[in-house]
């Protein structure tokens, strides 16, 4: 359960969707999931993920999720999958969708994404959170390592189906 805030706020069927509020009275998330087996443990979607969705709904009446069309593993996961792969920072591209924008960009399985628009990336969740702030059709620049050489790849974000 990545990208979620763990909370002890009571979440029951029918009351999910309410705000998660910090001690300053600020909304920091939307309560959404309760684990049945663990009494008193719930999860909320962070407000930084919700905000672009709400803004899109208020302006356009809908939300189109921007899409890169790839899946990557965090550096910490790689040794469990293949201990011959070594890199200092970034995320390892493990899969490229056949119909996504990454397919035509020149990205390859095995590339290491180190930055998006000059912002360092070390977790897939960081990449996802950044993409949440973008719109379908926006162009992003990915800095990648391939064969220990740095390259910049520009990708126009697609619409997630």
Residue ranges of predicted features:
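C-terminal recognition in membrane/secretory proteostasis and scaffolding
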Residues: 22, 52-161
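Short hydrophobic beta/alpha edge segments that flank linear recognition/processing sites
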Residues: 27-34, 113-116
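Short loop/turn motifs at secondary-structure junctions and domain boundaries
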Residues: 1-3, 9-13, 134-135
């Amino acid at each position: 359960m990545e990208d979620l805030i763990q909370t002890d706020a009571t979440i029951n069927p029918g009351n999910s969707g309410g705000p998660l509020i910090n001690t300053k009275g600020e909304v920091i998330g939307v309560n959404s999931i309760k684990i049945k087996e663990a009494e008193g443990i719930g999860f909320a979607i962070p407000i930084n993920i919700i905000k672009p969705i709400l803004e899109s709904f208020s302006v356009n009446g809908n939300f189109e999720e921007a899409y890169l069309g790839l899946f990557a593993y965090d550096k910490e996961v790689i040794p469990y999958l293949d201990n011959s792969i070594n890199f200092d920072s970034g995320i390892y591209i493990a899969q490229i969708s056949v119909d996504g924008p990454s397919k035509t960009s020149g990205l390859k399985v095995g590339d290491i994404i180190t930055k998006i628009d000059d912002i360092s990336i070390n977790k897939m969740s960081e990449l996802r959170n950044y993409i949440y702030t973008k719109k379908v059709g926006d162009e992003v620049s990915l800095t990648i390592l391939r064969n220990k050489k740095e390259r910049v790849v520009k990708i126009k974000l697609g619409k997630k189906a």
